[in-house]
Amino acid sequence: MKHGQDARAATAGKGSCKNLVRHLRRIVAVAGFLLVVLHIRADSAVLARALEQEGQHSLAALEYRRAALAATNAADAARWHWLAAHAYAAGHEWKLAGHMLDLVEETGLSGLDVPLVWLRAEQTLAERDWPAADFYFDSLVRRAEGAEWQAYAQRGRSIARLRRGDVAGARGGLESAPLEAVERYAAGRDRRPWVGGLLGLVPGLGYFYSGEIGNGVRSLLLNSLFIWGLVETAQDDQWAVFSVLAFAEFTWYSGSIYGGIDAAHRYNRRRLDAAVDALRDVERPRAVYDTLPVLTLRFEF
């Protein structure tokens, strides 16, 4: 008799969990944000969540990995590994985050498609793997729903393409302010390093070419000072001092040439970084865990 009551209670509990999940999904359909039911008991993640809130992301990730080892099936282990990857990503430990995502991908768990692609896109962008970042952000554009997700994914894809030098592709899907940022970048002109080096033959001009007025003036003054010193010491037959000044002048003069080359590279980097910063000016998804009988992950902007 008691066994029958326990069985009915367990069946009722499972039914209530299923009803809760269906109810949450209906809410999500109205609210428009992504929600993932992880089917993990919330009390199993209490310590890890507390560590994350304290900013101890590495320790939190270890707790999630410990839970993955104790999981009774591959699907649950994959969910714990995704949580570990998210914790590592929050601590900017991208290599470890990537390893955890590899373990998730091995299971082929479909319920984590969008969260998995999102973290992959973040990881590859942080690791400056521009082709891979382009691929994952493009996948996110195709899979994620909602205006906020689309805006985030499209901008991320544009950043990856700009970094790759694909300015035409970076325009894809953009509107208003982000599109204007790409158009401004496309309308501008990079400085050519070889031109900067050639102009550097005249002290300071290589810097002026790339807009580094302060460095240009400094180079011009110092080279002029050394040349004046060379003339004065030669007229006074002070050849020992002349030799020291000649070495210093050779160093500063060659520095003017190489400085012109470096200044051109810096100019191009600043111009690209300005366009990327404008594209980054968008709300990023934030993973929020709801404390329910089953751990639920939703993303807010």
PLM regions with names:
Residues 189-266:
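Hydrophobic alpha-helical membrane-anchor/signal-helix detector
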Residues 76-79, 115, 149-152:
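Start-of-helix register in tetratricopeptide repeats
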Residues 80-83, 119, 156:
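Canonical tetratricopeptide repeat
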Residues 52-96:
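N-terminal, post-signal-peptide region of Sec/Tat-exported proteins
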Residues 20-28:
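Bacterial N-terminal signal peptides that target proteins for export
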Residues 7-9, 15-16, 28:
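Short, low-complexity intrinsically disordered segments enriched in A/P/G/S/L with frequent Arg
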Residues 33-41:
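Hydrophobic h-region of N-terminal signal peptides that target proteins for export
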